[in-house]
Amino acid sequence: MEKRIVIVQCRLSSSRLPQKALKKIGNQTVLAWVLQSMKKVPASRYFVATDFASFGKIKDICDENEFECFAGELEDVLKRFVDLLNTVDCETVIRATADNPFLFYEAAIESVELFETKNKTEKNCDYLTFSGLPHGSGVEIFSASSLKKAASMTNDPYDHEHVGPALYNHKDLFNCEFINAPKKYNYPELRTTIDTYSDYLRAIMISLFLKNKNHPFSCEEIIDACQSDFVNNPVILYPSCKKGQGTGHLRRCLKLATQNNYFIFIPKKEDVPENFELLDEIPSLIEEFLQLICTKS
């Protein structure tokens, strides 16, 4: 029997930010960032649980990061997990989601060790998570057999869409523990998840702030970035791009932006093809990191 497995839940059909797992932060996809963080958590096997439509688009990323890719139901995520668990004999599941590139892997390791200790020395623990982490930096730990049992007992659409509630919304049947996170992880006011385009831009700023650090980033590094003025008060340059003015102002803004990791905003209404041609000359690596805010069509 496999002791632990990691399952990263991933879909590409988000209505607020479609295909967000495939968006780039630097030169890697959001999904790759998540998988590399979760690889720091010791486990017997590592899986991505996706839907059939997304499978072909993420399989290569999974392979590159030594994750097995499993396809199942799109809407019934609980069934997707159970179907995966029916293919592997394991005790403990560590669940993360593919829209959280700044996971606290240290907290994940501590929480799974606590979960396993409780199941050795106390009454059975079916589900455990640390509360108080930044929104987007935590994971869930649960018993594989308990989740299978829960799935067989609920028809609640919410339970089937979100997995964990099948356990913790039925505390009369399952022992679920929400442990207040240790002080070093306890920053509930911070946000690291990617749910909207604004979140995505913020994630880029976090990665830029930490560009001289080794990824996966430590919890201390992520917290420092999230609390920095660089991330919370980004500088957006708005160059004068009126037709006939030439490209001098835009060139100066580009120089400042590439030197200081500022953003540039050029509204779609600006009819300045010569300036857009200049933007096209920016080296691709700079463009990836700078993430110009430009509504060029």
Regions found by a protein language model. Give the residues of each.
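N-terminal nucleotide-binding beta1-loop-alpha1 segment
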Residues: 1-18, 236-239
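A short, glycine/small-residue-rich beta-strand->loop->alpha-helix junction that serves as a flexible
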Residues: 16-27, 241-252, 272-273
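A short, N-terminal amphipathic alpha-helix
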Residues: 30-45, 58-60, 255-260
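Short internal beta-strands
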Residues: 47-51, 262-269
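Short phosphate-binding loop-to-helix
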Residues: 53-118, 281-294
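Short, charged/polar "capping" segments at the starts of alpha-helices
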Residues: 54-58, 269-275
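Conserved core of the sugar-phosphate nucleotidyltransferase
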Residues: 103-193, 198-208, 221-228
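Active-site anion-handling motifs in enzyme catalytic cores
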Residues: 238, 267-273, 285-286
